[in-house]
């Protein structure tokens, strides 16, 4: 099974804790050992935001801020590559062809941001589409997709499952509200809808949750299920992991 895992920077390295990065590397290694082809996209998290806020105060324009954010995602990606100890590409892929080539070599393919104006949410969706991934997992700091921002609405209700089109409908109004926090960004949702990518949005604070979700479909997040989508092979009983 080919899977792309998007790990938020605030999930992987909220405080540059080496034990946390190592735990994520171990989880990814378990997926690879079980026969998965694994691509990983790493976000910038709080570190990126701090750099961006500082650079904005210094007068940097939006493209410069985006480039700074991309650089931070690649630093986080390098941390993960170091923890994977030779099982991944030597340096973060800077484009989709390079990332796909690493998969073809049998490596864990790790990348950060790619293009100014595009979040790592969207990068992960585009990467998954480009390699025809069976599954896309967003390991975030939120436990799935809600009908409203749970950070500001105590009555927000979580979806157990939804279609990609429904994901777009949920994310669209959040993308227009500067105070709202969408589970994935709008471009990512549209790419998932366009490509019909089976996806999961979950709380990735514990890396073991990602392993359970990929190998067994066992999680408490939200399944994004395209029409006619088949369950990944591991969920149909071909693996006892």
UniProtKB/Swiss-Prot annotation:
Positions of region (Disordered): 222-241
Function: Catalyzes the reversible phosphorylation of UMP to UDP.
Recorded family membership: Belongs to the UMP kinase family.
UniProt GO molecular function: ATP binding; UMP kinase activity
InterPro entries: AceGlu_kinase-like_sf, Asp/Glu/Uridylate_kinase, Uridylate_kinase, Uridylate_kinase_arch/spir
Organism, scientific name: Halorubrum lacusprofundi (strain ATCC 49239 / DSM 5036 / JCM 8891 / ACAM 34)
GO cellular component, one term: cytoplasm
Subunit annotation: Homohexamer.
Protein known as: Uridylate kinase
PANTHER family linked: URIDYLATE KINASE, URIDYLATE KINASE PUMPKIN, CHLOROPLASTIC
Record-listed UMP binding positions: 44, 66, 114-120
Main location: cytoplasm
Pfam families: AA_kinase (PF00696)
Keyword Manganese: no
EC number: 2.7.4.22
Localization (cell): Cytoplasm
GO biological process, one term: UDP biosynthetic process
Record entry for activity regulation: Inhibited by UTP.
Amino acids binding ATP: 9-10, 45, 49, 140, 146, 149
UniProt KW keywords: ATP-binding, Cytoplasm, Kinase, Nucleotide-binding, Pyrimidine biosynthesis, Transferase
């Amino acid at each position: 099974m080919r899977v792309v895992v998007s790990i938020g920077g605030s999930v992987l390295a909220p405080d540059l804790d080496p034990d946390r990065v190592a735990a994520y590397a171990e989880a990814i290694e378990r997926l690879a050992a079980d026969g998965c082809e694994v691509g990983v996209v790493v976000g910038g998290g709080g570190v990126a935001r701090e750099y961006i806020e500082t650079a904005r105060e210094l007068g940097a324009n939006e493209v410069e801020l985006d480039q700074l954010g991309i650089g931070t995602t690649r630093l986080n990606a390098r941390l993960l590559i170091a923890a994977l100890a030779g099982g991944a590409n030597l340096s973060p892929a800077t484009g989709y062809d390079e990332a796909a080539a690493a998969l073809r070599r049998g490596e864990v393919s790790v990348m950060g941001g790619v293009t100014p104006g595009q979040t790592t949410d969207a990068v992960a969706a585009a990467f998954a589409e480009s390699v025809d991934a069976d599954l896309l997992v967003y390991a975030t700091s939120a436990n799935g997709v809600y009908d409203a921002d749970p950070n500001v609405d105590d009555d927000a209700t979580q979806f157990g499952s939804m279609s990609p089109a429904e994901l777009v409908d949920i994310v669209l109004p959040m993308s227009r509200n500067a105070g709202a926090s969408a589970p994935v960004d709008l471009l990512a949702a549209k790419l998932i809808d366009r490509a019909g990518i089976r996806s999961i949005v979950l709380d990735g604070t514990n890396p073991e949750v990602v392993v359970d979700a990929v190998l067994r479909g066992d999680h408490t997040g939200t399944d994004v299920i395209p029409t006619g989508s088949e369950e990944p092979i591991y969920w149909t009983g071909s693996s006892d992991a």
